Amino acid sequence: MTISPPERGEKAKGGVPTPYDQPVDRGNAPVDFEKLNKPGFWSSKLSKGPKTTTWIWNLHADAHDFDTHLGDLEETSRKIFSAHFGHLAVVFIWMSAAFFHGARFSNYTGWLADPTNVKPGAQVVWPVVGQEILNADLGGNYHGLQITSGIFQMWRAWGITSEVQLMALAIGAVVMAALMLHGGIYHYHKAAPKLEWFQKIEPMIQHHQIALIGLGSIAWAGHLIHIGAPVSALLDAIDAGNPLVVDGVSIASASDVTNLAPKLCDPAIASQIFPSLAGRTVENFFTLNWWAFTDILTNKGGLNPVTGSLWMTDISHHHLAFGVFAIFGGHMWRNAVHGVGHSMKEIMDVHKGDPILFPAPKGHEGIFDFLSNSWHGQLSINLAMVGSASIVVAHHMYALPPYPYIAIDYPTVLGLFTHHMWIGGLFICGAAAHAGIAMIRDYDPAIHVDNVLDRMLKARDAIISHLNWVCMWLGFHSFGLYIHNDVMRALGRPQDMFSDTGIQLQPFLAQWVQNLQQSAVGTGQLVGAGNLPGNVLSEVFNGNVIEVGGKVAIGPIPLGTADLMIHHVHAFTIHVTLLILLKGVLYSRSSRLIPDKAQLGFRFPCDGPGRGGTCQVSSWDHVFLGLFWMYNSLSVVIFHFSWKMQSDVWGLTGGNFAQSSITINGWLRDFLWAQSSQVLTSYGQPISMYGLMFLGAHFVWAFSLMFLFSGRGYWQELFESIVWAHNKLKVAPTIQPRALSITQGRAVGVAHFLLGGIATTWAFFHARLIGLG
């Protein structure tokens, strides 16, 4: 059955376009506060007010679904564009709050003076109801809450050395928030862009790639070169016990650096720290004498032994190079100003693909038009890419720590890894959600015939059935290895276990990659002509242990049987998540069970009475189920990371990962139970808030099960009996109580499941590492 997408307003029907002389409409929509007094003003049904309690849930569910409010792509685009400015304003206010707390309440300068012994603290808890116990002794005569965001380490890398500078940033961020709010109002109510402006893809890419990313990265490189790196060099020298002398004055403290900071843009001063800043930088640049910059734009590699972080001059070099690449890449596209360059539509239309491996005769024809008319399609791709990038960042943050002293702040390292993993997982689930919406609302089967998208849909049974086979294979085999080990250990037969001392299952490919990286040192194998210095590679590749302040910043990460086993659990959970999410997209419009699924929309509970077994098959329900498996996947990842680092790198659990993590019982006993002692015994200590959070989050998680285990009918019957009792007492409400719909109940359930699970893990991790000191 062919089901076309709904019409989306005059601008989306593909008729004769209006002349594109001005990119905006002036005086588009005057500000109207009256309609805001009527909740649900965008819907004729909701705007009538509540008759049942379902009204408030529909209000929440549909508030941001601009597609259904308007049915017009131009107006939807304008609202989204305006909302972006509002979002940026919120981000700037949040940043301002962080800067303000740092300036007014924190121990930033105390930490800066002794970063290996003083712990970061954001604020002091006021003893309103006697909760001053939460103020821990963080060193340097400061009692307050210990923070684990890495913000102090980041500020030091920026070159911030005083509370005055933080307060200036706080004020600046508020000003930027005001500008963003004004921008949002202006670009919707005063000068609203036309649909054609939003659909000019090449200029949009150029603006983002050249102006925002390219020039932004180079501008940041400029800050690092002139402020960040010199300040870091001065502070590093102080921490190493060999303060630098600038203009005849020994720079022996952070306050000395603060006093010197305004002079760092003076070449005579800056060149005493980095000679290449001596004032002939422009001449050297334009005469191609770039070797003059090798002290400020370096390729040292490895970590700074004083701070346990990447060299600031390496980071400056990275941002400069990245910005140049982005600018070159952005100029690849053709725009209205000059007719030179590539057209993305032309590239995609002629790109056919492999006729044997992927037989789609029309290749990518129609894909450009689909994406330039489907913001859900674009958002899906962007969410998948940014989510994947967040997961990449999570793994780089500990292997190549970018900020000074962050590597020895173990709660922060674990917190940032966990944070970036959760963000990545949620974004990837969001990618599946918006891909499903795009397929239902924006996809026209009559246009997509024999192209790659059509080919994917035709091959969906093969794709999903193969994924299903892979998931079963991985699940049975990975879990089977653990069950075998539990049985053998229970029977007292360690020699028959899969382990490094029994039946070995060594990850030889991963070990080969590690050895390849390490053996490439000095051979030029990885960098072409030049030889590779010994410290270019991360220390995790069979490198050296780097200690800072008596704590391990980074060291080699050995891999063995335990890692191979948990790796296959990772593969299993990730493939199941992919199976669920991909099935939701590929079967979003139709299936053998429900051929007319596209007409039912993105979310629907069941396909009407008399058609049994058709509940929970909507694209929305696949995202719902995918979120649980995403949670499973990432729980295994962050537990693996936490235990592995404590055992094999930080030296906190005596290297017990290799022998304990190869059984289910080992995970329960030596990880969950043994490491939860800090959170369970936290009462009466500054970490007691994590004990309360641990219990409260468990309650939130358990609360979710009430929504996930019970059916709607159960609750409706219960409500009707309660309403009957109210009627008998003549106190019946005017708004009729209704049980949540199946979809609403599942949404509340998964939200509390994830919130409870994440907050429980948060309390468990932080209490563990903060409690150990």
From Swiss-Prot:
Membrane topology classification: Multi-pass membrane protein
Superkingdom of source: Bacteria
A single GO BP: photosynthesis
Chemical reaction(s) catalysed: reduced [plastocyanin] + hnu + oxidized [2Fe-2S]-[ferredoxin] = oxidized [plastocyanin] + reduced [2Fe-2S]-[ferredoxin]
PROSITE patterns: PHOTOSYSTEM_I_PSAAB
One GO CC annotation: plasma membrane-derived thylakoid membrane
Positions annotated to bind phylloquinone: 715
One Gene Ontology MF term: 4 iron, 4 sulfur cluster binding
TM region(s), chain numbering: 80-103, 166-189, 205-229, 315-333, 375-398, 414-440, 462-484, 564-582, 622-643, 687-709, 747-767
Binding residues annotated for divinylchlorophyll a', in chain numbering: 698
Subcellular location field: Cellular thylakoid membrane
Chain sites annotated for binding divinyl chlorophyll a: 706, 714
Region (Disordered): 1-29
SUPFAM superfamilies: Photosystem I subunits PsaA/PsaB (SSF81558)
EC top class named in words: oxidoreductase
EC number: 1.97.1.12
Alphabetic keyword roster: 4Fe-4S, Chlorophyll, Chromophore, Electron transport, Iron, Iron-sulfur, Magnesium, Membrane, Metal-binding, Oxidoreductase, Photosynthesis, Photosystem I, Thylakoid, Transmembrane, Transmembrane helix, Transport
Co-factor note (free text): PSI electron transfer chain: 5 divinyl chlorophyll a, 1 divinyl chlorophyll a', 2 phylloquinones and 3 4Fe-4S clusters. PSI core antenna: 90 divinyl chlorophyll a, 22 carotenoids, 3 phospholipids and 1 galactolipid. P700 is a divinyl chlorophyll a/divinyl chlorophyll a' dimer, A0 is one or more divinyl chlorophyll a, A1 is one or both phylloquinones and FX is a shared 4Fe-4S iron-sulfur center.
Annotated residues for binding of [4Fe-4S] cluster: 606, 615
Subunit and interaction comment: The PsaA/B heterodimer binds the P700 divinyl chlorophyll special pair and subsequent electron acceptors. PSI consists of a core antenna complex that captures photons, and an electron transfer chain that converts photonic excitation into a charge separation. The cyanobacterial PSI reaction center is composed of one copy each of PsaA,B,C,D,E,F,I,J,K,L,M and X, and forms trimeric complexes.
Function: PsaA and PsaB bind P700, the primary electron donor of photosystem I (PSI), as well as the electron acceptors A0, A1 and FX. PSI is a plastocyanin/cytochrome c6-ferredoxin oxidoreductase, converting photonic excitation into a charge separation, which transfers an electron from the donor P700 chlorophyll pair to the spectroscopically characterized acceptors A0, A1, FX, FA and FB in turn. Oxidized P700 is reduced on the lumenal side of the thylakoid membrane by plastocyanin or cytochrome c6.
PANTHER family on file: OUTER MEMBRANE PROTEIN, OMPA-RELATED, PHOTOSYSTEM I P700 CHLOROPHYLL A APOPROTEIN A1-RELATED
Listed name of the protein: Photosystem I P700 chlorophyll a apoprotein A1
Organism placement in taxonomy: Bacteria, Bacillati, Cyanobacteriota, Cyanophyceae, Synechococcales
